[in-house]
Amino acid sequence: MKQSKFLSLKEFVVVLLLACVEAAIGLVVTMPFAANLQLVYFLAPGLAGLINGIIYVLIIKKCPKIGAQFIIPAIYGLYFLFTGSVYVFIFFMILAVANELIMLGGGYQSKIRSAVPHALTWMLNAMGSTLTMLLFRDSLVESYVAMGMDATSADAAIASLEGFWLAPQNIAIALAAAAALSIVGYALGMKMLGKHFKPAGVA
């Protein structure tokens, strides 16, 4: 019997649960750094990618099928939707589709190609606020006004944040850190796959 290219119901549930674990880890990792904008931008996304690399490897080895890559960013994006960050949710949904396309045509057979969606997910996590300010600045100002600020104060508040979130050097550092740590996490997951997961029958 030919194996389906798409997730079965059981595999869907497995991926869904592991994706929820990834999202939870991503949120928990950020909490200790919440008071420090620099650490939230430069360290937290990469640290989440480092830890979640192990979970990600479990997902792609247990369920290397169409749908798995969509679920991971989609679940994380839903958190942002529920907290009111609609634009960040949209970014993650676009990434969910892109990650699926990246893995089509035998992507799961390539160790290098398999690492790309994981790195992109946590790089986007680092860029959520940056992209929102860059693409939807006027909407952000309007949201501040809706909360009771006058237009001038709202514009000044956004401008003060832009100096940090949109600085080219800060963007480069955040992307590089997220990518590097995510790849290290993926490599760690692959190492654990051979030493622990396969012998234990987990993957």
Regions from the PLM with identified roles:
Residues 18-29, 48, 52, 56, ...:
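Alpha-helical transmembrane segments of multipass membrane proteins
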